[in-house]
């Protein structure tokens, strides 16, 4: 017995020394990344030090801006951790090479330790080290053999990983197939919408096989598209959930109103409970058998319909799991989330660090980064046993991210577990019993083979990509590999162009550049995919992905890009309203950018937030007042793409090669245009004659003609030469406003 204790103590001491060496290696790299100006990359590495090797590592904790208080580490308010990347693009490749070398070194150390412990007949420690080998390298035959892994998608892994992989791929495939599947929808009469009738709001009704949707007459096309997405989601739900749905009309109807004023009008007319609170804090409410939602943009309308189907099909009733499953499906379908149980502005104050702003981003990749950092943290955060007790009226940012990411994980594992959790949560809420340990106990009685703490550990492993299979499911491009040479020079030129329009400078983020790299490489590998339509999508059969295709819709792309001609490139973008938005939009604070040879890709949608300029809000272009600016009177349709072609065709000008120079209003919001339905634009020539045109909202899918939160007035013909006058007008909360200006067309 004494010999065993001595051996165990020796092993423990050896493990401690081993962990210290691994921690030191990670800390060295983190310091290098930090000193080079990449604090977010360094942060993840220091969190790995703490999580994987030394929970009390002084170097890592203090570097992250913490101070020791007794036995705990707490944030030091005197040393806030920086979040903005300031490094040079030329440092990217060397830094990535160092990290790849570090991964190999860490894996080799674990491999040697595993072999040593196997010879010493310490299989417990040997298996632990073999598992860690696979955390650091893509594949290892010795580790796979020792762990008795099975073949999974060209890799090896455990039975659980096979379940996660197979279900994830099944859901991804269902979404990809459904995204291309059409469904019949029709505009009908004779179906009433009592909530809108009481509010005296005009509407039309669109139906599909299973769903009924009411909305504004001028949004007929969007209503049809939204119901098609609802039908697609129903098919995906049938694949994702093991329980069935009675194939009949949905029990509730849906109604979409274009702005918050109309939503308030509807709530008042229907005398809903908690009226004042709902008007101030929510964007959706169930009134009778109708779900009414504020949808100022088509993407928000899609979000609403997909969320309604996912939440209804799941049957979840508790706030945490209901919100979680809604975010899960919307995120997987669109890579964005725009609707929440409660308006986030009521929860977040005015903090404006990059991390705080990320909680406001609809970008699903940003959410994944937040979940990743949450999973790496060894203390604090929201625990899985707290999700059942989340309150819809007071969802914190951290609760929302954890509810979504945990629900997303467990849905991949076994949705029946989610249904059990939700039922227990609803029962405990009825009994007003807020007891996390009791929740865990009841769950374990239903699922004896797994515990909530075990699921939480699995959630951590999934989001931190603890094995090659989990990495293959996540398919993430690490930020350290998204730093491209020359990006800092492009950023300088970009900010010079913004300064020309009196806009604040923006910062660059490696985190926001990962999808930029993915799309740049896709375009590099597919040189025939050129032009506005092809450059703003990806084809799976050409090596693209459904998720990155969605990113490409709103990415800014320039092929044949040379940094020496950056000024000219940016000046030409004034003719492309979606690209123009980057220079006029006050809410763009941080961008992603990647350069691959002569291909430039910019992400201008992830890093949005409150404007740096005090008093800055929405604004028009050309600018208000008469600034004596001169613009081309027309834009070639070939530069704009199919959305401009369709606009001309819909207005009796099919085949025209040019369209008038567009006027734009930039709201900078990601969830649509708040004045939708209440916004007008009038354009006249020097003699006061009206210029015929069409006002278009942010409903498109090609960045050349569309940007989130941007409205565009398209003159259908080339503008008349000479002075052109315009007036934008709107109303909100019963108050009217306007912006007037003039410019010259040549």
What are these regions (language model features)?
Residues 669-671, 731-746:
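Extended, polar beta-sheet/loop recognition surfaces of beta-rich domains
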Residues 56-112, 119, 125-206, 456-484, ...:
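Pro/Ala/Gly-rich low-complexity, hydrophilic intrinsically disordered segments
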Residues 716-722:
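Surface-exposed, short loops/turns at beta-strand junctions within beta-sandwich domains
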Residues 474-685, 725-728:
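Functional surface patches built around histidine and acidic residues
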Residues 25-29, 91-96, 202-224, 474-481, ...:
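Acidic/histidine-rich, surface-exposed loop or edge segments in extracytoplasmic proteins
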Residues 201-322, 326, 335-336, 397, ...:
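Juxtacatalytic substrate-recognition/specificity segment
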Residues 41, 238-254, 314-322, 337-344, ...:
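Surface-exposed patches in mature extracellular/periplasmic domains of secreted proteins
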Residues 268-288, 316-475:
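Acidic/His/Gly-enriched intrinsically disordered linker/tail segments
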């Amino acid at each position: 017995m004494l010999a065993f204790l001595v051996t165990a103590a020796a092993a423990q001491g050896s493990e401690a020394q081993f962990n210290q060496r691994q921690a030191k290696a990670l800390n060295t790299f983190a310091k290098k990344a930090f000193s080079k100006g990449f604090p977010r990359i360094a942060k993840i590495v220091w969190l790995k030090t703490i999580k994987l090797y030394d929970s009390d590592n002084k170097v890592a904790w203090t570097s992250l801006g913490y101070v020791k208080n007794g036995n705990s580490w707490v944030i030091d308010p005197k040393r806030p951790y920086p979040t903005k990347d300031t490094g040079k693009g030329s440092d990217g490749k060397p830094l990535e090479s160092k990290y790849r070398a570090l991964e190999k070194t860490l894996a080799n150390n674990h491999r040697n330790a595993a072999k040593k412990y196997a010879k010493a007949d310490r299989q417990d420690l040997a298996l632990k080290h073999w598992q860690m080998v696979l955390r650091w390298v893509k594949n290892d035959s010795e580790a796979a053999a020792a762990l008795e892994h099975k073949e999974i998608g060209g890799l090896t892994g455990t039975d659980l990983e096979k379940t996660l992989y197979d279900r994830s791929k099944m859901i991804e495939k269902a979404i990809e197939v459904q995204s291309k599947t059409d469904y019949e929808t029709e505009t009908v009469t004779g179906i009433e919408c009592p909530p809108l009738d009481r509010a005296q709001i005009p509407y039309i009704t669109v139906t599909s096989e299973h769903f009924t949707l009411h909305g504004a007459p001028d949004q007929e096309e969007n209503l049809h598209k939204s119901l098609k997405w609802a039908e697609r989601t129903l098919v995906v739900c049938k694949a994702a959930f093991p329980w069935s749905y009675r194939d009949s009309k949905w029990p509730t109807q849906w109604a979409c109103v274009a702005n918050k004023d109309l939503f308030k009008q509807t709530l008042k007319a229907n005398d809903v409970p908690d009226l004042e609170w709902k008007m101030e804090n929510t964007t959706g409410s169930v009134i009778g058998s109708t779900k009414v939602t504020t949808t100022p943009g088509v993407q928000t309308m899609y979000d609403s319909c997909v969320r309604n189907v996912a939440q209804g099909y799941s049957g979840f009733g508790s706030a945490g799991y209901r919100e979680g499953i809604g975010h899960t499906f919307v995120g997987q379908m669109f890579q964005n989330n725009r609707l929440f149980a409660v308006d986030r502005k009521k929860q977040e104050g005015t903090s404006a660090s990059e991390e705080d702003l990320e909680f406001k981003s609809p970008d699903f990749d940003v959410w994944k980064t937040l979940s990743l950092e949450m999973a790496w943290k060894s203390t604090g955060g929201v625990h899985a046993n707290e999700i059942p007790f989340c309150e819809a009226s007071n969802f914190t940012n951290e609760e929302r991210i954890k509810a979504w990411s945990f629900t997303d994980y467990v849905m991949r594992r076994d949705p029946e577990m989610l249904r059990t959790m939700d039922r227990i949560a609803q029962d405990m809420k009825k009994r007003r019993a807020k007891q996390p340990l009791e929740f865990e106990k009841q769950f374990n009685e239903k699922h004896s083979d797994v515990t909530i703490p075990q699921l939480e550990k699995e959630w951590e492993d999934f989001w931190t990509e603890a094995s090659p299979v989990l990495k293959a499911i996540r398919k993430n491009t690490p930020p350290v590999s998204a730093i491209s040479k020359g990006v800092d020079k492009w950023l300088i030129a970009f900010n010079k162009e913004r300064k020309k329009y009196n806009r604040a400078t923006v910062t660059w983020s490696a985190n926001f550049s990962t999808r930029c790299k993915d799309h740049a490489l896709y375009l590099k590998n597919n040189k025939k995919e050129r032009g506005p339509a092809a450059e703003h999508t990806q084809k799976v059969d050409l090596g693209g992905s459904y998720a990155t295709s969605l990113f490409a819709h709103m990415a800014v792309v320039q092929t044949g890009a040379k940094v020496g001609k950056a000024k000219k490139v940016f000046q030409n973008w004034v003719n492309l309203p979606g690209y123009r938005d980057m220079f006029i939009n006050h809410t763009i604070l941080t961008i992603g950018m990647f350069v691959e040879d002569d291909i430039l890709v910019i992400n201008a949608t992830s890093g949005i937030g409150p404007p740096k300029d005090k008093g800055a809000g929405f604004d028009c272009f050309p600018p208000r007042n008469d600034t004596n600016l001169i613009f081309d009177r027309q834009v070639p349709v070939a530069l704009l793409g199919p959305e401009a072609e369709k606009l001309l065709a819909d207005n009796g000008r099919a085949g025209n090669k040019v369209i008038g120079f567009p006027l734009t209003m930039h709201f900078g919001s990601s969830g649509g245009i708040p004045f939708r339905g209440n916004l007008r634009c009038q354009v006249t020539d020097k003699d006061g004659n009206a210029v015929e045109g069409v006002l278009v909202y942010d409903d498109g899918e090609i960045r050349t003609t569309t940007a989130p939160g941007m409205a565009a007035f398209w003159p259908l013909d080339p503008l008349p030469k000479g002075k052109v006058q315009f007036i934008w007008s709107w109303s909100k909360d019963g108050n009217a406003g306007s912006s007037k200006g003039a410019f010259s067309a040549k």
